[in-house]
Amino acid sequence: MEFWSELQSYQSLRRLLELASARTSSCWRFIFGSTLTNVIYRAKEDYSSRFAELLSFNPGIFASLNLGHHSFFQEIVIKNLDFSSPGRTVSGLAFICFILDQWSAQTHLSEGYTLDYMTMALWRTLLRRKRVLGCSPAQPPHGLDPVREEEEEEEEEENLRAGLDPQTEL
């Protein structure tokens, strides 16, 4: 499954979280959602008891989010998400959707704000990790990516005489 393309932009990530959350009906998710949306929703439902257990260790997360103290959430949840493999990425997205559902159910804040906040926190983390790794977290390092190799071959074909011209010294 090539899912990294769905995480490339803020709008597509926001739509993905919205469609995988509980606020979207299963009919709407089936018709307008992607395979990744359904996989994330299924993972969220299957592991909801484990996610609830993880959140029970830090009961102040929702209170701090409601008060606008987002650094606690960043330190406890966001920094511990792992996007090193496709499975871990799906489980991280499912956990964020679970938190979004729980937070939306018990907050006075609008659903748009909660969705935007979760999307922005996740988006910033993905951008930061992409910048640090030099590649997308779910993609192999440089030299192992077949798409990049094809692009490099096309560039070489366009510039066939690059190595044949004699060097000129100035």
From Swiss-Prot:
The keyword Membrane applies. InterPro entries: Adenovir_t-Ag_E1B_19kDa, Bcl2-like. It holds the Pfam family Adeno_E1B_19K. This is E1B protein, small T-antigen. One of its GO terms (cellular component) is host cell nuclear lamina. The keyword Membrane applies. It comes from Human adenovirus F serotype 41 (HAdV-41). The lineage of its organism: Viruses, Varidnaviria, Bamfordvirae, Preplasmiviricota, Tectiliviricetes. Keywords: Apoptosis, Early protein, Host cell membrane, Host membrane, Host nucleus, Host-virus interaction, Inhibition of host apoptosis by viral BCL2-like protein, Membrane, Modulation of host cell apoptosis by virus.
